[in-house]
């Protein structure tokens, strides 16, 4: 079942007791997590309702979970409702002046356990939460008898599933625009980066863990290893732009060296950074590689010859490449890439740091690139 939200109803088990309002609960006060009741409470005397214990959380998704617990059989038949206190786990490093998330208080009828708690308006992907439970018995006058709070349990919600990513993919399809020809992938970095690759990695760029840019629920952030490339071209020249936010030195490599019939293509994310520009993250993985296996389990696979973002087709024995015009593609290649397969040269344009997407946070209010999952 889906549990309804009680916005201003239950007192938190981690705070002093407060009156429950709405839902005809005006006269009730709940215990805090230490089991203390207000001395002047209007609540009926507790009749030893069983306290939930041995709480189990499973079937966790990015916006739902199942919860169950054990309880003594004594007075079990008098339980009519469950009160659930759900809070984001406190981040000690968070900005103290930032508005705190309002704790979510849920009330549910006493259905058979396990019970599903679902709601994208109060559950965010890849986020740590604490949860505690009370049992309650509704009286004829509308008041409740409640148990003490259970122990506090911690859990973390999951990443976006393939289903959620497919929803993002469908939204990205809408704005991708027409396709433009291109012939090279490129990667900008500082000169020191390429010197380090030559001196310490045998002249081969190595995959590294993807940063946390993009959607908060993306399954590749902080997990997928790869090398970042671009393929955007200037409309009037058909060549890569001379400006870059990532460094004045550019490695260029022929497109067929990275993207060919021996690789698979995956959709990774769709996001923006409070601007009109939208970004699509794609992953290219050699067939059967560790990166390919990682993506196959987590990401929607694209038809390399027919999709709205990046294509590789054959014509007269040659491979032709096209990229979407109206989104900025960020391409992640999951294997090492030898510098000898391409060229490194200094660009003639500017280093536009303001356009960097390193650890960029997605605009959660954008209707173009958000789905109804998490906040």
From Swiss-Prot:
Superkingdom field: Eukaryota
Glycosylation sites recorded in the entry for this protein: 22, 36
Modified positions (Phosphoserine) in chain numbering: 11-12, 15, 24
Coiled-coil regions listed: none
Gene3D superfamilies named in the record: Immunoglobulins
Keywords attached to this entry: Glycoprotein, Phosphoprotein
Entry GO CC: cytoplasm
PROSITE patterns attached to this UniProt entry: FN3 (PS50853)
Spans traversing the lipid bilayer: none
Ranges of residues in domain Fibronectin type-III: 51-160
Function statement: May play a role in the development of the central system.
Family statement: Belongs to the PHYHIP family.
Protein name: Phytanoyl-CoA hydroxylase-interacting protein-like
Species of the source: Rattus norvegicus (Rat)
